[in-house]
Amino acid sequence: MPLSRWLRSVGVFLLPAPYWAPRERWLGSLRRPSLVHGYPVLAWHSARCWCQAWTEEPRALCSSLRMNGDQNSDVYAQEKQDFVQHFSQIVRVLTEDEMGHPEIGDAIARLKEVLEYNAIGGKYNRGLTVVVAFRELVEPRKQDADSLQRAWTVGWCVELLQAFFLVADDIMDSSLTRRGQICWYQKPGVGLDAINDANLLEACIYRLLKLYCREQPYYLNLIELFLQSSYQTEIGQTLDLLTAPQGNVDLVRFTEKRYKSIVKYKTAFYSFYLPIAAAMYMAGIDGEKEHANAKKILLEMGEFFQIQDDYLDLFGDPSVTGKIGTDIQDNKCSWLVVQCLQRATPEQYQILKENYGQKEAEKVARVKALYEELDLPAVFLQYEEDSYSHIMALIEQYAAPLPPAVFLGLARKIYKRRK
């Protein structure tokens, strides 16, 4: 009988370790106790695996993953201080041109203002995910000061990409506030000059990658990853705009299939796959299978995240979310309107048709009342539970050979979020 089958017969289930995993990590090193906490471990160096024993079926892994996710949920908080402190170095490096080229001094001053207004003030989840995943995937002895600086910098590149998208998106959506302050384009003296400012934010990504990573073997992979993520997100934004053109409310366009396509391209690739994939490349993990498996988990997380965002746009507290939602006024193909269309009676459909995509406050309120009449908040809460369980199952199935903690920290970070 093969060893793996015998182990399963006695209630021991195997998960592959990361490629670099040292013996002490498989055995539950104090540096990574959560991977094996509470369970007996069987490991041997040549097998490249760590094991957890249960007396129950493999389904127990799902509850174990929830527990380990809880234990790791503060890892983002642990990394946040160093990550945020690195921003001053990012700004300094990006504005050094002023000293060598005084003729562009006022443009560099504008760049500094753009960076400091638009790149900070968020939750930093995307950037921190790069750092957290890097620490999980890279051998501890290789996490020296230089490599950590590169990880922080790549994390900030993800945050700059996010800032670039948000500045442009706020203009297109006529948004009022972002991260608890007025949108950049709404500031006196900015206006549509914000379009160029958004382009500056994007250009900074590639300057930083060149300055910090050009001597690294993964440099080209990172360049291609950021370019591909930008393209995918902009395709998603195009789908979003085409589905809901201004002044033309067509509810027939708002199908679940269309919604999933928008979410996949506009949100999931850059918000979830990009940061984990960047850390994987930095750890030397560039195999197609490993990236494909990670993508299966992360794109599902991205859909989960965007549906939360759509719900919070209307039912969230602006003092908590930091923004005033405008999806109804902007005629957006959101999860709420898709769910409404699936449940509405002919009379309710007519109410939606007459009020959706309109700016008047009373019409917005009528749509919200319709959503509440259809009990969509309860539908969302049930979706949130079901989707989280599905994500846990995907982690169980596809995480290997990466440690599940790479995905669990991110999943726990967004589960039950309210901003």
Curated annotation (Swiss-Prot):
Subcellular localization(s) per the UniProt record: Cytoplasm
CDD domains referenced in this protein's UniProt entry, alphabetically: Trans_IPPS_HT (cd00685)
Sites marked Important for determining product chain length: 164-165
Keyword rRNA-binding: no
Pfam families given in the database record: polyprenyl_synt
Sites of N6-acetyllysine modification: 123, 353
Reaction catalyzed: isopentenyl diphosphate + dimethylallyl diphosphate = (2E)-geranyl diphosphate + diphosphate; isopentenyl diphosphate + (2E)-geranyl diphosphate = (2E,6E)-farnesyl diphosphate + diphosphate
GO terms assigned for molecular function: (2E,6E)-farnesyl diphosphate synthase activity; dimethylallyltranstransferase activity; metal ion binding; RNA binding
InterPro entries: FPS1-like, Isoprenoid_synthase_dom_sf, Polyprenyl_synt, Polyprenyl_synt_CS
GO biological process, one term: farnesyl diphosphate biosynthetic process
Annotated cofactor note: Binds 2 Mg(2+) ions per subunit.
Membrane-spanning residues: none
Pathway: Isoprenoid biosynthesis; farnesyl diphosphate biosynthesis; farnesyl diphosphate from geranyl diphosphate and isopentenyl diphosphate: step 1/1; Isoprenoid biosynthesis; geranyl diphosphate biosynthesis; geranyl diphosphate from dimethylallyl diphosphate and isopentenyl diphosphate: step 1/1
Function of the molecule: Key enzyme in isoprenoid biosynthesis which catalyzes the formation of farnesyl diphosphate (FPP), a precursor for several classes of essential metabolites including sterols, dolichols, carotenoids, and ubiquinones. FPP also serves as substrate for protein farnesylation and geranylgeranylation. Catalyzes the sequential condensation of isopentenyl pyrophosphate with the allylic pyrophosphates, dimethylallyl pyrophosphate, and then with the resultant geranylpyrophosphate to the ultimate product farnesyl pyrophosphate.
Name under which the protein is recorded: Farnesyl pyrophosphate synthase
Phylogenetic lineage: Eukaryota, Metazoa, Chordata, Craniata, Vertebrata
